[in-house]
Amino acid sequence: MVEYPYRTSYTKRRIVLILKVLPFFLLIIAALVGISQLQVVREFFGQASGEPANIQVDTQAVLGPMPRPWRNLAQGGEEHDWRMGKLVPSVRALNPEYIRIDHIYDFYEIVQGTPGNITFDFSKFDGVLDDIVASGAKPYIALSYMPPAISSGDILAVPVNWADWQLTVQKTIEHVSGTRGISDVYYEVWNEPDLFGDWKYYGDKNYITLYDYAQRGAKNARGVRPFKIGGPGITALYKNWFDALLKYAVANNARLDFFSWHRYNLDLDIYRKDMFEANNWLTQFPQLEPTLELHITEWGHDSNNHPGYDTNYGAAHAVAGSIEMIGVVDRAFAFEIQDGKDPEGKANWGRWGMFTHNDFGAAPKPRYSALRMLDRIGDQRLQLLGKGTWVKAAAARNDAGNTQVILSNFDRSGRNTENVPVTFKNIQPGNYSVVKEFLGGRKQTENVSTSAAELQVHVAMPANTVSLIELIPQ
């Protein structure tokens, strides 16, 4: 057989070329296959890179009173005749400080008549106020939407004349903060103006105009107890809205007591980030910085219906998010109290409520039970270190002098399980009972002894669970 050297050389060159190109082909194939699995890959690496919790509580390091930003609730516009009714005792058990209500002008028929000739009837709205007061809370009222009697179109339109809107706000404040005699009510001008009505902070449909006439009405209110007015309750924290409203307030000596926004997000760090940014922006307005309050007037893990609102997923997010707000957020309003009715007739349909619709027994969901558990934490906040990526925790001393730790393991993928070490430091040597209570009612008690000044226990925390631990001297 005759050999041809040029063929051998050519074959070698082809092999070398193939070996050089092969990695690029493999990379392209991997990319094509990987696109559909991108989220899985991200979650895998996120899971691998997360930090497990190693909780350490200094039982003698009291930081001060325990802040409770979670003691604020909101109810959306589910039904025109919604009342808390038989839910009042259950809501009262959450110890709410404020309950936010919107749709007051299009649901409760407060404004009647025609443009330029209007009257007011608060009788239907009074029932809602009665429920709020009976729950132990004060009203936080979103002044929304445009009363049909004065609107130039639908409930999201501008009024026929702005004087009617100004008078409407004035009379609302005079009724709630005057006739009803309720002190320290918050009035929030509109609800999500960037979504409901497509308001801007400039142009023909200008939220600044809406706010201006509202605060004029507030200034004209007579015979009233102390109250606060602000807004805008936008869908998220936006610097352009923040700057526009504060610049207007400073330039016009307008009353602006608080700035508000909503935040629906799975990122537990977002609330801290929001507050850091807002406080940083606020430094540019020294006239307002000493007094302006910052509120999150709706929050949850998803602004749309989501099955997690019916399960421990939403419960773990609510507690973990609340823990991350401690000492950072003054008021955050969990949305919402009760479900509306599912058009398909389901009891659980991923709605935001802590209770099902009345037609399904107004049954409490896990998020309600979790917030009740969270609120059992003691009043003296203790130093706690060692929170992880998924497991968040807070510690306090209760009235009995016992140390408590609330734990929440929120994992959006539902996979993270930890056997969380909890170390109690600066304790007296001796005998203790460790009571572990879990969302759903399961309870464990361990009797332990230590000759040292610290004690470590472990808490098994599957994904999306909440537990309350109490260390009791014997």
For the regions a protein language model found, what residue spans apply to each?
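Hydrophobic membrane-insertion alpha-helices, especially the h-region
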Residues: K20-G34
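N-terminal Lys/Arg-rich, disordered targeting/topogenic segments
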Residues: M1-I18
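Carbohydrate-binding surface patches
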Residues: G388-G430, N464-E470
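Substrate-binding cleft and catalytic face of glycoside hydrolase catalytic domains
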Residues: L94-L266
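Glycoside hydrolase catalytic-domain groove-lining segments
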Residues: R263-P307, D330
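N-terminal carbohydrate-binding accessory modules
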Residues: L38-Y98
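C-terminal beta-strand-rich structural cap/linker in extracellular carbohydrate-active enzymes
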Residues: S449-Q474
